[in-house]
Amino acid sequence: MPPKTEDYKAEQIQVLEGLEAVRKRPAMYIGSTSRDGLHHLVYEVVDNSIDEAMNGHCDTVTVELHKDGSCSVHDNGRGIPVDEHPQYKVPALEIVMTKLHAGGKFDSDTYKVSGGLHGVGVSVVNGLSEWTRVDVYREGGHYRQSYQRGEVNSGLERISDSDEHGTLVHFLPDTEIFETTQLEYELLRTRFRELAYLNAGLSISISEEGGRSESFCFEGGLAEYVSFLNDGRTTLMREPLLITTELEQVQVDAALQWTTAYREHIHTFANNIATREGGTHLSGLRSALTRTLNNVALKRKQLKEKDATLDGSDVREGLTCILSIKVPEPQFEGQ
């Protein structure tokens, strides 16, 4: 018989309100409280800006790492709405910043496609930061609201008139939450370069206050990405093959180039998120490549009906490929 324990009654059931749950169990939302989780904060804010870009409302994102350990992300998108929310009777900005599963990404008319943590991202960043300040530029005004560890620290303030449009999120990761709060320039730089390749024409800049700075913008998009990956390799094609199509609201973009290497290098993304474990888009690409090249070889008499068909591994030998899909309602096994 198990030993008798303390009484377990209704008053011992706790309900965590608002972002308290995020602070209590941060790893549930960002994976860890170590280096990876820390940088996930930056990625989440940037993902919001990228979502604006994917939906045609933003072409510039600027990230700055400040000397005090804070980070600011500025975009020239539409700006988070600041008018009063009809249900909650507070500014929409406050709802977005302080409540989980709040945002425009659940409305298909506002965001056709989006990445990130599906509506919890920026509020999680707020909850896991010592302080956060958001400046919004829209509808002829410059607005500001500040927060402390997920709680509203000041009401929405109209700072001035402004012809600008966009959002500036400035936050300081909380030392009470993270094992380290040192943001790494090189790690962020690598991710932002990747995002610039995946979103042709989007300019993403990263800088350190008083230090290094770099800006990425690739009009050639995925084709430039493949050329970058194949730098130093002997290619069998002068330029990468670029494929773009849309089927049933799914945008598919791929760039392919074969080299003399033996290994294949295929990188796949869904809504700008790397799908390292593959998925139906990768299996579809592989089967389509094998089927298409076999059909072409038969039509050109390079293969005869009685010959053995080309194997998938033979077709993909030396291939460098970037496959990027944009899906309205993606289902991720994990990010």
Q: Which role fits each region the language model picked out?
A:
Residues 1-46, 95:
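Bergerat-fold GHKL ATPase/HATPase_c domain
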Residues 21-24, 28, 51, 55, ...:
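Conserved helix-loop functional segments at active or binding sites
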Residues 36-60, 121-128:
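Conserved ATP-binding N-box helix of the HATPase_c
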Residues 186, 193-195, 201, 205-335:
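GHKL/Histidine-kinase-like ATPase module
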